[in-house]
């Protein structure tokens, strides 16, 4: 998982 460029809003949702 090296795509934390647009994974900011998804990270909250996912995590």
From Swiss-Prot:
The keyword Oxidoreductase applies. Keywords: Aromatic hydrocarbons catabolism, NAD, Oxidoreductase. Its EC number is 1.3.1.32. GO terms for molecular function: maleylacetate reductase activity. Belongs to the iron-containing alcohol dehydrogenase family. It comes from Rhodococcus opacus (Nocardia opaca). It catalyses: 3-oxoadipate + NAD(+) = maleylacetate + NADH + H(+); 3-oxoadipate + NADP(+) = maleylacetate + NADPH + H(+). GO terms for biological process: catabolic process. Signal peptide: none annotated. This is Putative maleylacetate reductase 2. It is an enzyme of class 1 (oxidoreductase). It comes from the Bacteria. Pathway: Aromatic compound metabolism; 3-chlorocatechol degradation. The lineage of its organism: Bacteria, Bacillati, Actinomycetota, Actinomycetes, Mycobacteriales.
């Amino acid at each position: 998982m090296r795509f934390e460029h647009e994974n900011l809003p998804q990270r909250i949702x996912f995590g």
